[in-house]
Amino acid sequence: MLNVTNLSFTYPRHSQPALKKLNFSLKPNTHVAIIGHNGSGKSTLVKLLGGFLKAPKQTIFFRGQPLEEVGFRQIGILLQDPDMQLLGDTLHQELIFSLENHGVDPKQMDRVIADVLAVVELQGKQFTPLSKLSFGEKQRAVFACLLAVKPELYLLDEAFSMLDGKLASKLKRFIFKVIKEQQKTVINVTHDFNDLFLADEIIFLSKGQLLKQFSPAAIYKQLHLFHQHHFTLPFPWLLAHEVADHLHHEMKGPIEELQDVVDWICKHLK
């Protein structure tokens, strides 16, 4: 579905490239998490895929066609701050604008709007001033605008990093569930290690290069990689890994809290 081929990019007046000969491919209906330090090239990649920056020709292909020829209508972007994407007064205005911009038949708009409001659980709030919505509701409002135009690829650039832990976890699981049900593809740029377990594939970027691509099942076998690149791993992760190693069991799944470690130990000591 998406092929990135020898993608390099250098910002104007910068001597060092932000991306260096990046190569990877994504299959349809795939959830990919991209992780790396600040300066690893994550946000640059999102900007190139989303059309905010102009990529060199013949380096990004969407369904076999150069992205510069296909355009960006099939790509939906969810950013860190929803206020950067919500420019109207109400969600209804935002939805109408998105639908008009994508050439949706005006006769179908009311049905589409009702459907997406139901999906994101914002029924009755389409005419509420956006300034009155909570941060989480605003993120769902942006997601509603994306759902309405049915993109094939969703780009999430640190979309949940400004939410508190529990709300972020609830919202991301909800959004990922909806995208999976639609059988669409998602690229999630993240600093949250537990997001990696929600993905099908993980891309580890370092200094503009693809350092490693692996599956969530191999995460605990790659802890040395995180250490080598000076990531501060969550304490529950480290504890879980040590306990699993001591018990000669393979650790799988997300470890968000110490209670997860306790539950896992109790399960394997029965």
Curated annotation (Swiss-Prot):
Record keyword Repeat present: no
Domain ABC transporter: 2-232
UniProtKB keywords: ATP-binding, Nucleotide-binding, Transport
Matching InterPro entries: AAA+_ATPase, ABC_transporter-like_ATP-bd, ABC_transporter-like_CS, ABC_transpr_CbiO/EcfA_su, ECF_ABC_transporter_ATP-bd, P-loop_NTPase
TM region positions: none
Any GO molecular function: ATPase-coupled transmembrane transporter activity
Family the UniProt entry places it in: Belongs to the ABC transporter superfamily.
Protein's name in the database: Putative ABC transporter ATP-binding protein MG304 homolog
